[in-house]
């Protein structure tokens, strides 16, 4: 298959789940996975791609169980936001060790730990080839990190949100449960809604749809997949505005 000589995206928003960082571990951060992801991001920077990153926090904290046990949802979400900051610190450190300039911004003030989120500063950093990691979600409870990824993607005028998952893209059914499940190459926003496919939560998905922000779902566990996506190769599932 012919490949493009240049990346097809100039500016991307990469959404990593917290679970992706834990690798084979049941909890926390797998250092080898973290370093591999940092190297893959470095490849994009060397190609001239501007990279924003949003990381979830599910590897360190999951509020659903505590909410069922009676914890206030707002408190649980604030704890989840802090988990994303911890993951962001780890990713920033991994990027620095890979000799990639990276800045960590938080939607909630954490002076002395990371920068406060600033749209203008983020744009300036991206234009100068810095990787910008956006943490603490949207800064508000009741919003997922997928919503944060779409919001930041729209704000920084990213060409696409790249949602890194543990599967090869969007399937007609859960491939772990249904051997007949079909992997989609492309889908419109409307097709995703009509088929009730699980891409991301509805608030996040609607935000992307309303601003015609394409989403590509791919498997980050496949070495080189991120680069292939950015170079326009047929990797994962593209969700777009028809």
Swiss-Prot record:
Pathway: Pyrimidine metabolism; CTP biosynthesis via de novo pathway; UDP from UMP (UMPK route): step 1/1. One of its GO terms (biological process) is UDP biosynthetic process. The keyword Amino-acid biosynthesis does not apply. ATP binds at residues 15-18, 58, 62, 165, 171, 174. UMP binds at residues 57, 77, 138-145. It is found in: Cytoplasm. CDD domains: AAK_UMPK-PyrH-Ec (cd04254). Residues 23-28 are annotated as: Involved in allosteric activation by GTP. Transmembrane segments: none annotated. GO terms for cellular component: cytosol. Allosterically activated by GTP. Inhibited by UTP. Keywords: Allosteric enzyme, ATP-binding, Cytoplasm, Kinase, Nucleotide-binding, Pyrimidine biosynthesis, Transferase. It is an enzyme of class 2 (transferase). InterPro entries: AceGlu_kinase-like_sf, Asp/Glu/Uridylate_kinase, Uridylate_kinase, Uridylate_kinase_bac. It comes from the Bacteria. It catalyses: UMP + ATP = UDP + ADP. It holds the Pfam family AA_kinase. GO terms for molecular function: ATP binding; UMP kinase activity. Its EC number is 2.7.4.22. Homohexamer. Catalyzes the reversible phosphorylation of UMP to UDP. PANTHER family: URIDYLATE KINASE, URIDYLATE KINASE PUMPKIN, CHLOROPLASTIC. Belongs to the UMP kinase family. This is Uridylate kinase. It comes from Photorhabdus laumondii subsp. laumondii (strain DSM 15139 / CIP 105565 / TT01) (Photorhabdus luminescens subsp. laumondii).
């Amino acid at each position: 298959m012919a490949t493009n000589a240049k990346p097809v995206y100039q500016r991307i928003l990469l959404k990593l789940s917290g679970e992706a960082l834990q690798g084979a571990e049941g909890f926390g951060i797998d250092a080898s996975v973290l370093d591999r992801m940092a190297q893959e991001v470095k490849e994009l920077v060397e190609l001239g791609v501007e990279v924003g990153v949003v990381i979830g926090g599910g590897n360190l904290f999951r509020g659903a169980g505590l909410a069922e046990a009676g914890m206030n949802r707002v408190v649980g979400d604030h704890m989840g936001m802090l988990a994303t900051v911890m993951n962001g610190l780890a990713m920033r450190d991994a990027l620095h060790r890979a000799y990639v300039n990276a800045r960590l911004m938080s939607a909630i003030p954490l002076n002395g730990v990371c920068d406060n989120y600033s749209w203008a500063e983020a744009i300036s950093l991206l234009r100068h080839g810095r990787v910008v990691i956006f943490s603490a979600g949207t800064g508000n409870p009741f919003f997922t990190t997928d919503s944060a990824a779409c919001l930041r993607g729209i704000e920084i005028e990213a060409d696409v949100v790249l949602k890194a998952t543990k599967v090869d893209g969007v399937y007609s059914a859960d491939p772990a449960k249904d051997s007949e499940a079909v992997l989609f190459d492309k889908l419109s926003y409307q097709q995703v809604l009509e088929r009730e496919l699980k891409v991301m939560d509805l608030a996040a998905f609607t935000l992307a749809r309303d601003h015609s922000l394409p989403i590509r779902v791919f498997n980050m566990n496949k070495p080189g997949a991120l680069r292939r996506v950015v170079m326009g190769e047929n990797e994962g599932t593209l969700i777009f505005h028809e």
